[in-house]
Amino acid sequence: MGDSEMAVFGAAAPYLRKSEKERLEAQTRPFDLKKDVFVPDDKQEFVKAKIVSREGGKVTAETEYGKTVTVKEDQVMQQNPPKFDKIEDMAMLTFLHEPAVLYNLKDRYGSWMIYTYSGLFCVTVNPYKWLPVYTPEVVAAYRGKKRSEAPPHIFSISDNAYQYMLTDRENQSILITGESGAGKTVNTKRVIQYFAVIAAIGDRSKKDQSPGKGTLEDQIIQANPALEAFGNAKTVRNDNSSRFGKFIRIHFGATGKLASADIETYLLEKSRVIFQLKAERDYHIFYQILSNKKPELLDMLLITNNPYDYAFISQGETTVASIDDAEELMATDNAFDVLGFTSEEKNSMYKLTGAIMHFGNMKFKLKQREEQAEPDGTEEADKSAYLMGLNSADLLKGLCHPRVKVGNEYVTKGQNVQQVIYATGALAKAVYERMFNWMVTRINATLETKQPRQYFIGVLDIAGFEIFDFNSFEQLCINFTNEKLQQFFNHHMFVLEQEEYKKEGIEWTFIDFGMDLQACIDLIEKPMGIMSILEEECMFPKATDMTFKAKLFDNHLGKSANFQKPRNIKGKPEAHFSLIHYAGIVDYNIIGWLQKNKDPLNETVVGLYQKSSLKLLSTLFANYAGADAPIEKGKGKAKKGSSFQTVSALHRENLNKLMTNLRSTHPHFVRCIIPNETKSPGVMDNPLVMHQLRCNGVLEGIRICRKGFPNRILYGDFRQRYRILNPAAIPEGQFIDSRKGAEKLLSSLDIDHNQYKFGHTKVFFKAGLLGLLEEMRDERLSRIITRIQAQSRGVLARMEYKKLLERRDSLLVIQWNIRAFMGVKNWPWMKLYFKIKPLLKSAEREKEMASMKEEFTRLKEALEKSEARRKELEEKMVSLLQEKNDLQLQVQAEQDNLADAEERCDQLIKNKIQLEAKVKEMNERLEDEEEMNAELTAKKRKLEDECSELKRDIDDLELTLAKVEKEKHATENKVKNLTEEMAGLDEIIAKLTKEKKALQEAHQQALDDLQAEEDKVNTLTKAKVKLEQQVDDLEGSLEQEKKVRMDLERAKRKLEGDLKLTQESIMDLENDKQQLDERLKKKDFELNALNARIEDEQALGSQLQKKLKELQARIEELEEELEAERTARAKVEKLRSDLSRELEEISERLEEAGGATSVQIEMNKKREAEFQKMRRDLEEATLQHEATAAALRKKHADSVAELGEQIDNLQRVKQKLEKEKSEFKLELDDVTSNMEQIIKAKANLEKMCRTLEDQMNEHRSKAEETQRSVNDLTSQRAKLQTENGELSRQLDEKEALISQLTRGKLTYTQQLEDLKRQLEEEVKAKNALAHALQSARHDCDLLREQYEEETEAKAELQRVLSKANSEVAQWRTKYETDAIQRTEELEEAKKKLAQRLQEAEEAVEAVNAKCSSLEKTKHRLQNEIEDLMVDVERSNAAAAALDKKQRNFDKILAEWKQKYEESQSELESSQKEARSLSTELFKLKNAYEESLEHLETFKRENKNLQEEISDLTEQLGSSGKTIHELEKVRKQLEAEKMELQSALEEAEASLEHEEGKILRAQLEFNQIKAEIERKLAEKDEEMEQAKRNHLRVVDSLQTSLDAETRSRNEALRVKKKMEGDLNEMEIQLSHANRMAAEAQKQVKSLQSLLKDTQIQLDDAVRANDDLKENIAIVERRNNLLQAELEELRAVVEQTERSRKLAEQELIETSERVQLLHSQNTSLINQKKKMDADLSQLQTEVEEAVQECRNAEEKAKKAITDAAMMAEELKKEQDTSAHLERMKKNMEQTIKDLQHRLDEAEQIALKGGKKQLQKLEARVRELENELEAEQKRNAESVKGMRKSERRIKELTYQTEEDRKNLLRLQDLVDKLQLKVKAYKRQAEEAEEQANTNLSKFRKVQHELDEAEERADIAESQVNKLRAKSRDIGTKGLNEE
C-alpha cells in the first residue's frame, strides 16, 4: 500500500505505516550481516553492536554506545537486514529472537506506530498520549479490509473477526490481555465502538426503545461507564485500571446487524473495598458520590463530602488529576438511565455503597475483664442499618455475638475485636461483590433484546500474567488463568500454522504445543494438585497455612518438575514455594490462603441481610447457603457440609466455562504492553517490555514459530528478488514457471536443503535462512557493482588517455610549424611574399563583390517570386482546409447515419431471432410442461403408495418397539428377582449343569435349523415381494395405458379432422417421404437406446432398493446393540448406586465411630470428593461407550472392576479405622496413599469389576436358561396362536373389502363404457350438424355474391340502354334540322340507327329476360336461405343443447372418474395390505413349523434325560401335557405346511408364466407408447416449424405483394372503371375465401392465410397481364359470369339435396371448433403480433436500405472530392519539391557567397570594413528571410501531409461504406433464400402429416392388440389371486 493508498486514513496515516521515503532510506542504510548483532546488556537487556573479533568461542563487540564487551558466542544474536526495519508482522523477521522483537517494537513505538502483528498476535504499546487513529475516518478506512490490505490496528482485528463471522458462519472471540495500565480497557472500548458503528441496527431499535432508554448501540457503549464506576480504580501504573476481567459477547443477526449483548465478569478485586496502598485508591464510585455533584445523594446516604471521614476509602489517595469525579458521576448516572435502571434500583445501589462507607467507621472495644468485643458507639451502625434496611441492634448483636450451630443446636459465640473487624470487612466485601455481580446481571437483562441472534463476537478483557515480589493467592488464580489461555493460544496458533503447511502440501509431523503447558496446569487443577489440596485443607478446622505447605511439599516436591522450593533472598518478602510457568518462575507466599479461599461470612448477619427491607440487599443474599445450611429432603447426608463453594472452586468453574466458550469460537489475540512505569510518552523501558513479552506469550509464540517455517514468500516475488544469486539457473529468453524457477534457483545454491520447503503457492523457510539469502544477495550485488565501477573507471581512464595523446600530437604539429616559421620569417623573399599576397587578394575580392551584387539582385527577384508563390499557396491551403473540414463533416455524418442504419439492422435481426427463439421456446416449454405434468402425476401416485407403505412400516416398527420395551422391562424385573434368588439357586445350578450342556447342544442345533429355515423363508419372501411389486407396476402401467388410450382416441379424432383438411396438399408432400422414413429409423434407433438406458436405470434402482433394505436391517441391528449397551449401562449405574450407598454407610459408621470431630468431617469430605471424581470418570466412560460399541464394552468392564476393587479397599480401610482408632491420624495418611494407588490402578480395578460382572451374569444365565427354554416355547406358541387368529380375521376383512371393491369397479367400468358410447354418439351427431351448418353458410355466401354480381350487370345494361336512347334523340333532332341537305345521309344513318336500335332492343330484351330469371332465382334463393336460416337456428339450438348436455356429461364423467380412481387406489392399497399380510402369514407359519420341529427335538431329548431332570419336572409342572398338545398342533401344521407348499409352488409357477407374458406385453406396450409419443412430438415440432416457416413466407410474400400492388396500380390507372369493378369482385372473393377458411381450416389457420396471400398474388399477376388486353378480359368476365350463374343454379339444387348431410357435418365441425378454438385464437394473436413486428421490421429494413443508398451516393461524392484533393495535393507536392530545389540552390549560393566573403575580408581588411558590414547585415537579413521561408515551407509540407493522410482516411471510410452496403444486400438475398426454404419446409410438413397419419393407424391397431393382451393378463392375475385366497381360506378353515 503506497502513500496514495494510505491517504484514505487521513491524519492517521503517519501513525499506521511508514512512508515510501522512510522505507527507501531504511533499505539504503549501511549494513553488514556478519558483523551487526545484538549482545546482552545488564540495563538494556540487549543492545546493538558490531563484532570486532572472534576467539575461542567468545566474541568481542563494540556496542552502539561505544562500549567494548566480550560475550559467549551463543549469546550473540544477528540483526535483521534493513528491509525488515519496522516490519508490521514480526513473524516475518528472518532472525526471530527476543532482541529482534524488542527493537522492532521499540523502533515502531518511536515512530508512534503502536500496533504490530506477531503472527496471530496483535501487540499494542500504550502511547500515553492521544493519537488520531480512532476517528470515524479510520473506522471507514478499515471496514471490509483484509488483514494484509491495511496496517496493523485493533480495528483490523475487529473487522476481520466480523467478516469471518459473516463468511464462515462461526462465532468469534477477541482476547485482550496485558498488565494494568497497558491499555486493555481502551482497546476493549475501541472494539465495541467499531462493532457499534459497522453493525448498527438503525431505526429498528429506536422504534422499540422505551422512554428513557437508548438504542442497543448506546446501551452497549454505556455499559462501560457503569462497569468502570464500580469496577475500576486508580493503581500505581494506571489511573483507570480495571480490577476485574470481563468477557463481553456481542450477538449479531444472520445479516450482521446487532441483536443483543451480554457480559461475564471474573476475579473482581474485592479486597480493594476495604484496603488500598498509599499510591492507589478505592473504586471510583465512592469518590464520585462524594464529589457533591448531586447533593441529594449526600443527604440520602447520610454522608459528608470529605473522603477522609471514611476509613475504608481513605487509606491511599483520594483524588486523581486525570479524572473529574463530578463529571464521571453524571456519566455513571446517565449510563444507568440509558441502560434502563429504575430510580429505585439506582438509589438502592447508592445506599449500599454508602452503607459500606459507614461500615468502615464502626468501632468496637473489649469488655472489661473479658476478651469479648462490644460496640464503641452506635451512630455509624445506626446509619448503616438504616441504609441497609436492618435493625441496628440486631446488626451489632450479630457482629459481636453471632450464633453458631454445634451439633443440632445453635449457641451464641463471643467474638474479640479483631474477629469482629475482620467480619465487618468480609461483610462489606461480600455486599460490594454481590452488588457488582447483580449490576452485571441487570445490564445483561437490558442488553438481551427479543431480536433473533445467530452469531456472537466475544471480547475478553482480563489481566495478564503477574510476577511481583510478593505473589499471593490472587496472583496464582490470574497466572493459572493465563496459563490456560496461553495453552489455548499455543494449540490454536500452531494448529492454524500446521493447517497452512497441510494446505500448501508440505510434509509435516503434527506437534501439539498445547501440551507443553499441561504439566503446570495439572499441577494446579488436577486431583491432589495445589487447588485440590487447598480445598481439602479448608475442610479441616484445625488446618493452617503451614499444614497446607507441608502437604504441598509432601505431594509435589521432587515429584513434579514444575514445583520447586524457593530461594529466599534478603530484602525480599518470604516465599513458600515456586512454580515454573511458561512466563518464568514465580515465588508464592501462602499466608492467608486458607482464609481467602474459604472467604467465611458472619452467617447471623447474612440472615439479617436476607430479611432486609431493602429489596436489593435481600435479593443479593437470597441464595446464600453456608456450611451449616439445612439439608434438603431427599438428598441424604452426602450434601452435609458441602453446600458452600470455595473461591478456588468457583474460579475453576468460571474458568472452565470461559474456556468452553472460547473453544467454540475462532479466536483473535491482542497483547497490550506497558512501555514504562512513569507514564512517559515515547519512552520504552527494555527490561519491563521484555518481562511482559515473556509473560503474555509473544516470545512463546516466537518459540513455536521457530520450530516451523516462519518465513514464506510467493514464488513470483522470490524469483524476482533472488534471481540475481544465480541468473544461469533461470535463463532470460525462455519461459519457466515461477515454482520451477524457484526450485532450480534454490537447488543451485550452496545452502542446507532441509531449511526450506516448497508449497503450492509459496516457498517456506526456516528461521534465519532468509537472512542468509539476503546476505548472499548483498554480496552478489556488491560484486556486480564493484565490477561495473571497475569497468566504468577503465573506460573513463582510456578516454582521458586518448585526449592526452591527441593533445600531444596537436602540440607537436604547432611546435613544428612555429619552428619552421621562425626559420624562414627573416628571408627576403618571405618578406616580399608577405607584402604582395594581400594585394592579390584585394583584386580577386573586387571581382567577387561584383559577382555577388549580381547574384544578390537575382536572389532578391527570386525571393519576391517565391513570396508571391507562397501567398498563393497559403490562400489555396486555406481553401483546401475549408473543403477538407466540410468533407470531414460530411463523412462524419455519413458514418453516423451508416452506424445508425447498421445498428437498427442488427437490432431488427436480433429482435427477429429473439422472437423466433421465444416462439420455439414457448412451444418447447408447453411440451415440457405437459410431459412434466404427466410425470409428476405418476410420481405423485407412486409417492402416495410409498408413503402409505412407509406409514405401515412405521406402525409395525412402533409396535415392535413397544414389544421390545415391554420385554425389556420384563427382563429387568426378572433380573431383579433372579438376583434376589441367586443365593438359593446356587445349589440348583450345580445339579442342572449337566442338563444345561445337553440343552445347549440341542438349542444350538435348533438354532442352526431355525436359521436355515429363516434363510429359505427370506428368499421366498423376497421372490414373492418382487413378483407382487411387478404385478403392482403392471397394474399401474395398465391404468396409465388406459388413460393414454383415451388421450390417443381424442388425438385420433382430432387427427381425422385434420386429415380432411390436409388431403388437398397430400400429393405435394409425397416427394420427401423417403427422407422422413430415414429420420424415423434414426429416431427408432435412438428410442431403443433410450429404452436400454431406462432398463439399466431401473436395474440400478432395484439394486439401490436392495441396498437400502440391507442398510435398514443393519440399522435395526445397531439399535439392538445400542439397547443392549444401554441395559448394561443401567446395570453399571445400579452397581454404582449400590457402591455409593455402601460408601455412605461406611461414612456413617466412621461418623458414629469418631463422633462429630473435625477429622471425621474431613474424611467425609474427602470420601465425597473421591466419590464425585469417580462419578465424573464413570460418566466420561459412559459417554465413550455410546461412541463405539467395542470401547463401550471394554470400559464397562474396567469401570465395574474398578468399583469392585474400590469396595474391597474401602472395606479394608473401614476395618483399619475400627481397629486402630487411637492411631487415626497415621491411618488417615495411609488411606490417602491408598487412594492415590487406587487412582493409579484404575484400569486393573475396572478389569476385576468386569470379571465380577461376568461371573454374576453366568450365575444368572444358569438360573434362567432352564426356565426360559420351556417358558419361551409356551409363550411363543400362545403368541403365535393369537397372532394367527388376528391375522386370519384381518385377512378375511381385507378379502371381503377386495371383493366389494372389485364389484364396485366392474359396475363403474360398465357405466363408464356406456357413458363413453353415448358421448361418442353425441359427438358424432354434433359434428355432422356443425358441418352441415358450415356448408350451408358457405353456399349462402356464394349465392349472395352471385346475386350481387347479376344486379351490377343489370345496372350496367340499363346504363347502356339509356345511353343508346339519348343517342337516338340526338340523331332525331339532327335529322329534323338537316332533313333537306342530308336526306341520303339520314337514310343511311336511319338504317344504321335502326339496325343498332334493333340490336339494343334485342340486348335489352335479353337483359330483361336475364333479369327476370335472376329475380326468380333471387326469390327462390331468398326462400331457401330463409329455410336454411331456420334450419341453422334449429341446429344452433340443438348444438347448444348438446353442448350443455355434453358439459353435464363431462362433469358426471369426471366425478365417476375421480370415484373410480379413488376406488382403484383403495383397491391397490388393500391388495398391498393383503399381500403383506399373506407374506407375514407365511412367515409366521414357517416360524410356527420350525418351533414345532424344535419342540419335537426337545421332546426326544427330554425322554432321554427323564431320569436326570426329576427335580425339574416338579418345577415345570405341566410341561409334559403342553408338549403333547404342541405335538398335535405340530402335526396339523405340518400337514398344512405341505398343502401350502404345494399351493405356493403352483402359484409361483403360474406367476412366473404370467410374469413372462406381462413383461412381454409391457415391453411391447412401452415400445408402442414410446413410438407414439416420439411421433407425436415430431409431429408437434414439425407443425411448429411449419408455422414459423409460414410466418416467414407470409412476410416475404407481403413484400412481393406490395411491389405487385404498385405495378398493378400503375396499370389500373388506364381503366379506372374496370379496376373498380375488379377490386370489388376481388374484395368479395377474398371475403368469401376468409369465411370459408375460418369455417373449414381453423387448425391450419396460418396455412390458409398463406394460401389466401398466394391467391391474392396470383390474382394481382393475372390482373397485370389481363389489363393489357382490356376488351378480351371484359368479354371473358361476362362469359364466366354467365357460366357461374348456371353453375350457381345447379349448386342451389345440389345444396337442397345435401342439406341433411350438412347438418351432420355441422355437428362435427362445431366440436372441432370448440376443441381448436383456444389454440387458434392464441396462434392468431401471435400471428397478428408477429405480422405487426415483421411489417415494422420490413419498413425499418427499407429505411436502412434507403439510407445505405444515400450513404453510397455520398461516398461517391466523397471519392470524387478526394480525387480532386489528391490532384491538388500532387500539385502542392510538385511546388514543394520546386521550393526545396530552390532552397538547396540558395544554400549553395550562400555557401559560395560566404566563401567569397571570407576572401574579401582578407583582401579588404583595411578599406572595406563599412562595405563589409553592410554586406554582412544584408546577408543576415537574407538568412533570416531564408529561415522564415524554410519554416513556412515546412509548415506547408506538414499541412500537405495531414491533408494526404486525411484523404487516405476518407478513401478507406468510403471503401468500408461500400462493403457495408454489399453486406446489407447479401443479407437481403439470404433472407429471401430463407423465405423460399421455409416454403419448401411447409410443403414437407404437410407431406409428413400424411405419413404420420398412416403410422398412427398402424400404432392404433397395435395399441388395440396390446390392450387385449393386457386384459387377458389382468384376468389371469385375478384368477391367481382368487386361487391364492381360496388356498388361504382353506388353510385357515383346517386350522
Curated annotation (Swiss-Prot):
Outcome following mutation: residue 723 to G: In CMH1; malignant phenotype
Organism listed in the record: Homo sapiens
Biological process per Gene Ontology, one example term: regulation of slow-twitch skeletal muscle fiber contraction
Modified residues (Phosphoserine): 1137, 1269, 1510
Main location: cytoplasm
Record's disease association: Cardiomyopathy, familial hypertrophic, 1: A hereditary heart disorder characterized by ventricular hypertrophy, which is usually asymmetric and often involves the interventricular septum. The symptoms include dyspnea, syncope, collapse, palpitations, and chest pain. They can be readily provoked by exercise. The disorder has inter- and intrafamilial variability ranging from benign to malignant forms with high risk of cardiac failure and sudden cardiac death.
Result after altering residue 441 to M: In MPD1; uncertain significance
Effect of residue 1573 to K: In CMD1S; uncertain significance
InterPro entries recorded: IQ_motif_EF-hand-BS, Kinesin_motor_dom_sf, Myosin_head_motor_dom-like, Myosin_N, Myosin_S1_N, Myosin_tail, P-loop_NTPase, XRCC4-like_C
Subunit structure, interactors included: Muscle myosin is a hexameric protein that consists of 2 heavy chain subunits (MHC), 2 alkali light chain subunits (MLC) and 2 regulatory light chain subunits (MLC-2). Interacts with ECPAS. Interacts (via C-terminus) with LRRC39.
Compositional bias annotation for Basic and acidic residues: 1923-1935
Record PTM Phosphothreonine, positions in chain: 378, 1282, 1309, 1513
Taxonomic lineage from the root: Eukaryota, Metazoa, Chordata, Craniata, Vertebrata
Impact when changing residue 515 to V: In CMH1; infrequent
Protein name per Swiss-Prot or TrEMBL: Myosin-7
Effect annotated for changing residue 1883 to K: In CMH1; uncertain significance
Gene for this chain: MYH7
Domain of life: Eukaryota
Modified residues (N6,N6,N6-trimethyllysine): 129
GO cellular component: cytoplasm; muscle myosin complex; myofibril; myosin complex; myosin filament; myosin II complex; sarcomere; stress fiber
